[in-house]
Amino acid sequence: EIAQCLVGSEMCIRDRMESLKNNGIKAKMLVRDKQTDQISVVRLKSNWLQVWKFMWERIVIWSANRFRRYHLFDVDIANTGTDITSLPEFRQADVIHLHWINQGMLSLNDIRKILTSGKPVVWTMHDMWPCTGICHYARECNNYQQECHDCPYIYKGGGRKDLSYRTFRKKQKLYSYAPIHFVTCSHWLKEQAQTSALFEGKSVTNIPNAINTNLFKPMNKKEARAKFMLPEGKKLVLFGSLKITDKRKGVDYLIGACKLLAEKHPEWKDSLGVVVFGNQSQQLQEQLPFHVYPLPYIKNEHEVVNIYNAVDLFAIPSLEENLPNMIMEAMACGVPCVGFNVGGIPEMIDHLHNGYVAQYKSSEDFANGIHWILTEPEYNELSAQACRKVLGNYSESIVAKKYTDVYNKITGKYA
């Protein structure tokens, strides 16, 4: 039996920990912010010093931006964190598995201590940060493929030896201490990582996120709508995000698509509605030509399952994505999705088979996708195919088996 210590954001790894435990892996999770009462989830000590560490990282970024808030929370430099190597959970583990460790959780120096402990390390990438200098998504910038500098996330493009350059060089040195087995959640992210100069000669495996298919599954649509007082006779499109107005979530393209649909299909004005859940969801009521049903951001997973089951389509106009859990959740509930051709989205949605992959940043094609799904005569088959895709690729047992293979491989190598 392998004892494992998972380190990172609880939201990213809680389901994965449960699936590993169900497959014979003894797992403990170290988190900064604990959201459950599970004893296998251990919260790192929280005090004024931890708050100061988080603030200090932001102050350094703020000063690099000439004391402007420019991209202040879009980058991380991991200059502060918590040393976990003396904790019993660390000492008892055979494998250390890092996940999303930013914003004051682990510093690069803390990771160096983990690497020099001699324990094998797996690091699941939830974005590009491990393979770039300071950014989580490089967008059009390719500097990380040779060496980060003149960073577009720094005010006026930084400079030749800016914060991105200095952090990139620190990561280069860090990765030389001991092997790290990197895991990406999508083929797209694996391709990006393998082009990085930081990952030259590094092991990278692609393993998708897992989903609890016993929880996320098709249910009675009429009953689901009744729980949120949604109308029975309308076609409903769902859009959701932690922060609705976040430009990266592409809400402007959804607004554009809906306006095009209203122009081309005026008969839809009374037969189509948009369910919006997330913080600031009310702001869309004045901007969409269809009736909007705003819901707050919901954390309770059982309620989230009901929301998916209440709608006919999930729209995700995001401009940056790895392997979005919300697509997985919607498809598991039998809800076809429309998303842009970006990141890992086209790996999840099979175009015209279980959903629609729209041309990047095209409101017109996004509108085409919404129209195609809502008018598809074989909608029930489309829905069934969405379910099958998740069951065949993202179920907990399938993903846990892939991770178990990685653990067995690296513990054997280090034995």
Regions found by a protein language model. Give the residues of each.
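Conserved acidic donor-binding segment of nucleotide-sugar-dependent glycosyltransferases
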Residues: 351-352, 356-363, 372-377
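Short alpha-helical donor nucleotide-sugar binding micro-motif in glycosyltransferases
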Residues: 306-311
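Aromatic "clamp/platform" in nucleotide-sugar-dependent glycosyltransferases that forms part
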Residues: 319
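Single conserved hydrophobic/aromatic residue that forms the stacking wall/gate
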Residues: 1-7
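Nucleotide-activated donor-binding/catalytic signature segment of Leloir-type glycosyltransferases, i.e.
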Residues: 265-271, 276-305
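Short hydrophobic beta-strand element within catalytic cores of glycosyltransferases
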Residues: 336-339
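A short, well-ordered alpha-helix in the C-terminal region of glycosyltransferases
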Residues: 365, 378-393, 402-405
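Conserved donor-binding/catalytic core segment of Leloir-type glycosyltransferases
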Residues: 231-249, 255-259
